């Protein structure tokens, strides 16, 4: 039998998963690595540690699966997006720690660019908002902060990359300096219409083209592993950012299909076809993937606090001992008793984008119990996701037929049922929850002919459970109206 090795490089750990030709998981290996916080608001990773943990778990997964590298048809890479590295092309050594997507050190630069009236230009070309979250301003900071870096970059001595590029460089022994279009579209430097680095944006940020990777398809044979890494040369054949890979792994391959990943936060993506849609509701437009030189696009929105709100019930309020207890506690009451909890602990993301919003609980009476607070917390995850989906439907002009879900919180049946009730469409949980790694495996497998086409891949996608909406639309509208009033009370609370 043939196998695909998926490398899933995340924010807190590096993982490797071996899939067989039926898309069944044969082995998983995982290692955490250090989070580095040099100053408040700064978040870094050691690029060497990312590489060491990733290659380590790859070897471990092959051992656990009981297979040799010669049986691996291809490697697919998926990664934490936006995290920025700069390294020496000759030595392969990073010049600085990786600047992580969560890092806010370039917020002032973004504010200056906005004050200069440049946000509409960036938005129109990249589909993104001008925010420190994305890679472009992080790279500009590195070129400015490291002595001599800009002149060395101009001379072609340095290489920039997001984590996919860094892994491909190391896996190929320094032969490949590439990124796929889905990762490139998260940099603030890539024009999502021309599918190329944008010279006007590069000039604004002072970034030389010579430092940038070549942009490639999300599924294609780019090269192979260097001889001393595994006991065989394995084709490197798939790359995609983690959320786009999850969309592919969920077989959301046609316009209007959507997936929501429920984790610490939520990431919701809707496939919107072969043309980018400019959002009118503060959503991001991104490349979903590029195959055969042709891009497909998605609308994306983020919920900052989802599972993190349940952690707060445990660690902050102490009303549960473990996150797993929240469902039983919330289910012990028939509803939230009129309580709304808006978990805007770090502001609100799309479609509101209000950094000054703060957490709010409204509707409390003497009859309110810990169970009502727990239920309102779970419901807040579904309300925030519903707000995003409504905005996406309006932007795309498409009515959602179903929502495919993944991530740890999908094990919570009460949450999934309430999500279906609010949306009025089925919520579908797949049998394989490792959809991010599966998406990378599918992209690589397609490139080497392990699977014929995307129709065959869609045939492998299997349902674990479908949550059908059971609430009347009038009641759902009433609940969403009440939620909207609660959000208004949370907004602007910490404004100067």
UniProtKB/Swiss-Prot annotation:
Q: What biological processes does GO assign it? A: glycerol catabolic process; glycerol metabolic process; glycerol-3-phosphate metabolic process
Q: What is its EC number?
A: 2.7.1.30
Identify which top EC class this enzyme belongs to.
Answer: transferase
The reaction(s) catalysed by this protein are: glycerol + ATP = sn-glycerol 3-phosphate + ADP + H(+)
Per the record, its GO cellular-component terms are: cytosol
Which keywords does this Swiss-Prot/TrEMBL entry list? ATP-binding, Glycerol metabolism, Kinase, Nucleotide-binding, Transferase
Activity regulation (UniProt): Inhibited by fructose 1,6-bisphosphate (FBP).
Q: What does this protein do?
A: Key enzyme in the regulation of glycerol uptake and metabolism. Catalyzes the phosphorylation of glycerol to yield sn-glycerol 3-phosphate.
This chain's protein is named: Glycerol kinase
Native organism is Geobacter metallireducens (strain ATCC 53774 / DSM 7210 / GS-15)
| Species classification | Bacteria, Pseudomonadati, Thermodesulfobacteriota, Desulfuromonadia, Geobacterales
Q: Which gene underlies this protein? A: glpK
